């Protein structure tokens, strides 16, 4: 029989993989007949690996040291017409073009750029220049031959983070209000602000008056809201306000407000997300962007205080739904970097506020019914809600709902309206959407592992995350607050972690398979 393992968490290091044999001479695709050596570095600390190179029969310039002088629009169109044979606005190995283009160098000669990768890099550089409104540009050949991993990392660091950064204030509202998921007929933009934040309400109403182009309506959100209230908001979905900071004008002394920046996932997801933000922050901290990594922690504290949970995202249709909990580890990582980067400042007040918010979230969200199961002491994903989730694409539930629409002899849209407002009762459909909401809260959407049963499952990942919460809280109270945080003591939290481990071993451990499995509470 296998030994009974102790409960592990995702943060514990896995054993190292065995070293793989490495080829003596790396093979690279070249269009040169002679050895050209390594590429010139794109930056001082990131030298690119060689890619497929360009050729030039009219110049003695060394490859990768050349610079091309190009007309942005003309070259962009010529490159697409010649190389993008499948019309997807990209250049890939699927395209059937000649994989070669001739460009002028800054010295007046011509050079041929060859190969899928270099042409794709050229297209990307031209697209970036077009977005910036540039008509002419100089491109270094080294940019086009840059190692793809270095290139991607550099572009994330220098472009993508900033392009995906949002702020909910006068300067940032136009960009962040956009919601591709909004299928309502309401054409004006809506911003919901907690009713107990009068300064924020006044600020946003002033912005709405001063910026009629935003077509913005600002509404106060009550302190407490029911599933019925949130369902009715789905007819007028909007953005939910999050944390702001007050700023004082040094010249006039006037007090104004500014949104705290955060990074969005992008595409259809143009708002602050819960566990997305944690993993985004890991990259931000790696790239030295503490300013952007800290913001979501402040926003999550605000959400717990005003919306009673860290929401799936800060749109009105997410008001009742959370996501996998990462706040304690998130806080620890940011706090450690704050202390390292600004050792002369006292960061304990910030840590205390975040830790107290995490304790509140732990108790009121994950250790309260319906998410908490009193019989086992374990927790599950189980958000409240009524009706069909409105943020999905229009046809997402069509096949599911069509038989019900036929039963009531109406269109799918009409049946959805009746079902959402309780005019028809379908227990099987209620059960389906109970689990569907839980799947979305779990972050596992979509997965056959949890499909149609998620609200019944004490999943191993959620137990591990809450175990991490309990240990994190205990260690921070002990190490940072002399074992007393407003009456909270580490021993109690360590015991909670030990209890969870015992319950997980009891209910989720499969002795025969030697693995932990989700436990069906029903």
Which functions belong to the PLM regions below?
Residues 1-522:
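Acidic, mature catalytic/reactive cores of soluble proteins
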């Amino acid at each position: 029989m296998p030994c009974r393992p102790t409960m592990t968490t995702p943060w514990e290091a896995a054993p190292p993989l065995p070293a793989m044999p490495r080829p003596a001479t790396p093979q690279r695709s070249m269009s040169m007949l002679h050895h050209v050596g390594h590429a010139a570095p794109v930056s001082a600390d990131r030298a690119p690996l060689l890619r497929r190179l360009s050729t030039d029969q009219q110049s003695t310039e060394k490859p990768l040291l050349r610079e091309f002088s190009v007309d942005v629009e003309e070259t962009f169109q010529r490159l697409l017409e010649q190389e993008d044979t499948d019309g997807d606005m990209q250049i890939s190995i699927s395209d059937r073009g000649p994989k070669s283009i001739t460009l002028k160098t800054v010295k007046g000669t011509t050079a041929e750029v060859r190969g899928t990768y270099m042409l794709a890099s050229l297209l990307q550089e031209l697209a970036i220049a077009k977005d910036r409104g540039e008509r002419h540009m100089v491109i270094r050949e080294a940019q086009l031959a840059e190692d793809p991993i270095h290139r991607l990392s550099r572009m994330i660091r220098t472009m993508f983070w900033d392009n995906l950064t949002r702020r909910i204030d006068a300067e940032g509202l136009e960009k962040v209000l956009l919601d591709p998921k909004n299928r309502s007929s309401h054409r004006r933009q809506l911003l919901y602000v907690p009713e107990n934040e009068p300064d924020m309400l006044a600020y946003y109403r002033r912005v709405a008056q001063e910026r009629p182009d935003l077509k913005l309506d600002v509404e106060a959100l009550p302190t407490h809201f029911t599933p019925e209230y949130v369902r009715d908001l789905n007819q007028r979905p909007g953005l939910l306000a999050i944390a702001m900071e007050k700023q004082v004008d040094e010249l006039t002394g006037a007090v104004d407000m500014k949104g705290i920046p955060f990074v969005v996932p992008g595409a259809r997801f143009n708002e602050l997300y819960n566990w997305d933000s944690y993993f985004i922050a890991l990259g931000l901290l790696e790239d030295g962007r503490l300013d952007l990594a800290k913001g979501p922690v402040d926003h999550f504290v605000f959400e717990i205080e005003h919306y009673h949970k860290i929401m799936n995202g800060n749109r009105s249709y997410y008001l009742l739904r959370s996501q996998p909990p990462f706040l304690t580890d998130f806080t620890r990582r940011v706090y450690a970097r704050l202390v390292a980067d600004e050792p002369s400042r006292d960061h304990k007040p910030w840590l205390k506020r975040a830790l107290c918010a995490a304790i509140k979230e732990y108790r009121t969200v994950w250790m309260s019914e319906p998410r908490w199961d009193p019989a086992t002491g374990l927790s599950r994903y189980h958000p409240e809600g009524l009706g069909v989730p409105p943020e999905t694409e229009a046809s997402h539930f069509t096949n599911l709902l069509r038989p019900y629409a036929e039963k009531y002899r109406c269109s799918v849209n009409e049946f959805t309206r009746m079902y959402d407002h309780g005019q028809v009762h379908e227990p099987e459909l209620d059960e389906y959407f109970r689990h569907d909401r839980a799947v979305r809260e779990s972050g596992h959407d979509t997965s056959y592992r949890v499909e149609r049963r998620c609200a019944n499952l004490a999943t191993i990942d959620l137990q591990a995350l809450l175990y991490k919460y309990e240990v994190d809280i205990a260690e921070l109270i002990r190490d940072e607050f002399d074992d007393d945080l407003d009456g909270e003591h580490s021993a109690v939290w360590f015991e909670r972690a030990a209890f969870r481990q015992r319950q997980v071993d009891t209910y989720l451990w499969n002795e025969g398979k030697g693995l932990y499995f989700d436990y069906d509470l029903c």
